[in-house]
């Protein structure tokens, strides 16, 4: 069987994959078959880690908010803060609250103290009505 020389389309496809893998070390950056396998692995990892990154950032924000709230001194924890925020219909997401905890902690304290005052006032009002 005679050898068929491939045209420019196959060469263009291979050079495109080589540009994708130009920074990889060893055979993974030089050999076409190894590049293709490693590219599939890289796409899989990037897809998996995009969802993992969302999860990790959410955990980080929750940890920062909880640490800042516990420093406040009043008996408040993260879950109660979020519950009371939703009860008051203050829809501040966790990313915004974490930024407040880092950059402007006094503002976060004011928000949490105001919410706690309102909750205490309403609970005492319901006790008096009964």
Curated annotation (Swiss-Prot):
InterPro entries, sorted: Ribosomal_bL20, RIBOSOMAL_L20_CS, Ribosomal_protein_bL20_C
A cellular component term, taken from the record's GO annotations: chloroplast
UniProt-recorded Gene Ontology molecular function terms: rRNA binding; structural constituent of ribosome
PROSITE patterns: RIBOSOMAL_L20
Cellular localisation: Plastid, Chloroplast
One Pfam family this sequence matches: Ribosomal_L20
A biological-process GO annotation: ribosomal large subunit assembly
Predominant subcellular localization, coarse grouping: plastid
CDD domains: Ribosomal_L20
Family statement drawn from the similarity comment of this UniProt entry: Belongs to the bacterial ribosomal protein bL20 family.
Family matches, as HAMAP family: Ribosomal_bL20 (MF_00382)
Task of the protein: Binds directly to 23S ribosomal RNA and is necessary for the in vitro assembly process of the 50S ribosomal subunit. It is not involved in the protein synthesizing functions of that subunit.
Name of the protein in question: Large ribosomal subunit protein bL20c
Species: Oenothera argillicola
């Amino acid at each position: 069987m005679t050898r068929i020389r491939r045209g420019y389309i196959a060469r263009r496809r291979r050079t495109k994959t080589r540009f994708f893998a130009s920074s990889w070390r060893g055979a993974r950056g030089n050999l076409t078959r190894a590049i293709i396998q490693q590219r599939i692995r890289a796409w899989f990892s990037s897809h998996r880690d995009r969802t993992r990154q969302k999860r990790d950032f959410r955990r980080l924000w929750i940890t920062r908010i909880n640490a800042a709230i516990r420093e406040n001194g009043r008996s408040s924890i993260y879950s109660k803060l979020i519950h009371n925020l939703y009860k008051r219909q203050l829809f501040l997401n966790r990313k915004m609250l974490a930024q407040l905890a880092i950059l402007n902690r006094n503002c976060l304290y004011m928000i949490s103290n105001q919410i706690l005052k309102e909750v205490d006032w309403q609970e005492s009002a319901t006790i008096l009505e009964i």
